[in-house]
Amino acid sequence: MNLIGPSHLQATDEFALSENLFGVLTEHAAGPLGQNLDLESYSPYNNVQFPQVQPQISSSSYYSNLGFYPQQPEDWYSPGLYELRRMPTESVYQGETEVSEMPVTKKPRMAASSAGRIKGDELCVVCGDRASGYHYNALTCEGCKGFFRRSITKNAVYKCKNGGNCVMDMYMRRKCQDCRLRKCREMGMLAECLLTEIQCKSKRLRKNVKQHADQTVNEDSEGRDLRQVTSTTKLCREKTELTVDQQTLLDYIMDSYSKQRMPQEITNKILKEEFSAEENFLILTEMATSHVQILVEFTKRLPGFQTLDHEDQIALLKGSAVEAMFLRSAEIFNKKLPAGHADLLEERIRKSGISDEYITPMFSFYKSVGELKMTQEEYALLTAIVILSPDRQYIKDREAVEKLQEPLLDVLQKLCKIYQPENPQHFACLLGRLTELRTFNHHHAEMLMSWRVNDHKFTPLLCEIWDVQ
């Protein structure tokens, strides 16, 4: 669940909503890229027409008996808001983008996540060999770690000759891959803990930057003039600029993103007034519902999204919902809260009944994002990149999704060079935050499980996008 604040879109003829609800960012972004835009001047988007959402499905409200925040229209809670419709093919963004210096492979490739090292004589929960650490959410040896990574990366399919009844040990692990992989999953190893292709690029970028930095230091030690390095940096900054098509793409993304504003009355309510744990939970549920609505509308407006297979659209939206909401919450936490209110908000959320084991890493993530001093353009692009991740489950045409994501990565990489030329690792750091975001999918699933046990209620929209029965 997104635990910071709701985000709402301005009402349109196609998407009628309560006047006091929609839009997310209260202030305009600084600089020329954040100014109000006249999209009529951008030819690739002149003819874009966004389809109407299907008629809303009426449902009984969970909140009709509560008076501590305004009651919203019944259709606000409806799963009908989640329905995505196709857009005519001719309205697809056709702008050509400059080829990025960062290579992008045709198919997503995964890599191992960093594992926590351990001490002592702990044994691998899969085969009984000596464990080397926690790999992909389970205590395993290096052998089972590598086997699981290779199996998931290659989408391997094994078949047991003994009907799937092999007892896994250090001997049998080499004889039956089917039972070994099954045991890995039973012991809690998670495919989603493998790094995505984007995060692999981030690791490579970090490594390359470090090697370049070491080389620069060596040259300086041999008597190179430091002023030459400064001159080179300035020259690089002068040459780095967006192409016309990239600027058009960025303007379009920012226009969709900047239509969002954070309703101050709801945030102020949770900051200024103390409620019971149950009331806090209901407020947070309403905030999450609002975030999902904004996510749906922003996603529908991503260039090329509605040309994808309809099932792929659903898979992308459901797969990215948690990560996109936490990223949006990080922006609100770091840029939109009144001064000195961050600690107060954390205190109030801890009183909502949610376990500290989920809240602590969440706020640690918010603070780590704040340290990067991200611009609004970077938040918008990173959100779009998260949504258009080709390695989500159930995606049928991954290459088509990747083609939509690549131009966004190119623009983000250039913006990092423009805004922070003195920090060549900034782009890699932004992508590295996606690794942290992936862990929230697992935490969120555990939270939902605990809430179902406690019989907490969700709006139909949240039930649909979170697959809550």
UniProtKB/Swiss-Prot annotation:
One Pfam family here: Hormone_recep
Domain NR LBD per the UniProt entry, residue ranges: 245-469
Gene Ontology CC terms, in alphabetical order: euchromatin; nucleus; receptor complex; RNA polymerase II transcription regulator complex
Covalent cross-link site, Glycyl lysine isopeptide (Lys-Gly) (interchain with G-Cter in SUMO1): 119, 272
Signal peptide as annotated in the record: none
InterPro entries: NHR-like_dom_sf, NR_LBD_NR1H4, Nucl_hrmn_rcpt_lig-bd, Nuclear_hormone_rcpt_NR1, Nuclear_hrmn_rcpt, ThyrH_rcpt, Znf_hrmn_rcpt, Znf_NHR/GATA
Residue ranges flagged as DNA-binding region: 121-196
Induction: Heterodimer of NR1H4 and RXR activated by farnesol.
Positions of transmembrane segments: none
Keywords: Acetylation, Activator, DNA-binding, Immunity, Inflammatory response, Innate immunity, Isopeptide bond, Metal-binding, Methylation, Nucleus, Phosphoprotein, Receptor, Repressor, Transcription, Transcription regulation, Ubl conjugation, Zinc, Zinc-finger
Gene3D superfamilies named in the record: Erythroid Transcription Factor GATA-1, subunit A, Retinoid X Receptor
GO biological process, one term: response to glucose
Phosphothreonine: residues carrying this PTM: 439
Modified residues (Phosphoserine): 132, 151
Subcellular location, record wording: Nucleus
Function of the protein: Ligand-activated transcription factor. Receptor for bile acids (BAs) such as chenodeoxycholic acid (CDCA), lithocholic acid, deoxycholic acid (DCA) and allocholic acid (ACA). Plays a essential role in BA homeostasis through the regulation of genes involved in BA synthesis, conjugation and enterohepatic circulation. Also regulates lipid and glucose homeostasis and is involved innate immune response.
Oligomeric and partner information: Heterodimer with RXRA; the heterodimerization enhances the binding affinity for LXXLL motifs from coactivators. Binds DNA predominantly as a heterodimer with RXRA. After activation by agonist binding interacts with coactivators. Interacts with NCOA1, NCOA2, PPARGC1A, CARM1, SETD7, PRMT1, GPS2, SMARCA4 and MED1, EP300 and SMARCD1. Interacts with XRCC5 and XRCC6; decreasing NR1H4/FXR transactivation activity towards ABCB11/BSEP. Interacts with PAGR1 AND NCOA6; indicative for an association with an MLL2/MLL3 complex (ASCOM).
Family, per entry: Belongs to the nuclear hormone receptor family. NR1 subfamily.
Protein name as it appears in the record: Bile acid receptor
Organism phylogeny: Eukaryota, Metazoa, Chordata, Craniata, Vertebrata
